[in-house]
Amino acid sequence: GDVYKRQEHMVLGKELTEQEISEGFGRAAQKLKEGQQFAFVLKKDFLEIEEKSIYVNDNSLIREDVIAQIIESLDESDVVVSTTGKISREVYEQSDRINGSHAQDFLTVGGMGHASMIAFGIAENAKEKRVYCMDGDGAELMHMGSLAFIAKQKPQNFVHICLNNEAHESVGGMPTGCVGLSYAEVARTVGYEAVYYIDTMEELKQVLHDIKPE
């Protein structure tokens, strides 16, 4: 049958010129338009391996320690919504270690950029609860319009925490598109009523204490 017919293909090797490769892609595109298949076979070492991004920052705080401190400060009625990637993994681990359960957690796994609006939705529909959104700088960058929307609504039981390491650490550590951006200034500019920039564990403990309702 047709499935056993020789499939048209092209072997890609370093000896090929850019023109030859371009012509090969043209043939492949034509075959696909005709509803046929086309395969590219890559010789060993055809692709060059680039050096892995070296992930470094000069932050004095460690994300896992910050997450642990936040979870330790929670009241039983509080809710945590965490963004995708390592933040949710560490929220899961620290909640397990500190509380022995995940009853307060909503882990936004696979929903990069959506944690803040999910947290806002919970806050709006459960005003008796305090909702902590643990966001990452890369995830927050995905849907920055949500900051302006949330600020306009002025929720009184919503705490938005951006853990900024200036990198997409979960997928290799490449820098985000806004290295050096002050997320605190962005939040202040769009209308967040109270904004804190935290650089030490002592500052974190103080702010977590100060923002609790009296």
Where are these regions (language model features)?
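Short, small-residue-biased leader/transition segments that mark boundaries at the very start
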Residues: 3-4
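Active-site diphosphate/adenylate-binding microenvironment
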Residues: 50-112
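Short beta-strand segments
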Residues: 39-43, 81-83, 134-135, 159-164, ...
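Short acidic, glycine/serine/threonine-rich loops at helix termini
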Residues: 23, 50-55, 91-95, 144-145, ...
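Short, glycine/polar-rich helix-capping loops at beta-to-alpha or helix-loop-helix junctions
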Residues: 91, 176-189
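Structural signature of the thiamine diphosphate
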Residues: 8-54, 184-214
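General beta-strand structural signal in soluble alpha/beta enzymes
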Residues: 10-12, 40-42, 79-84, 106-110, ...
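Thiamine diphosphate
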Residues: 92-165
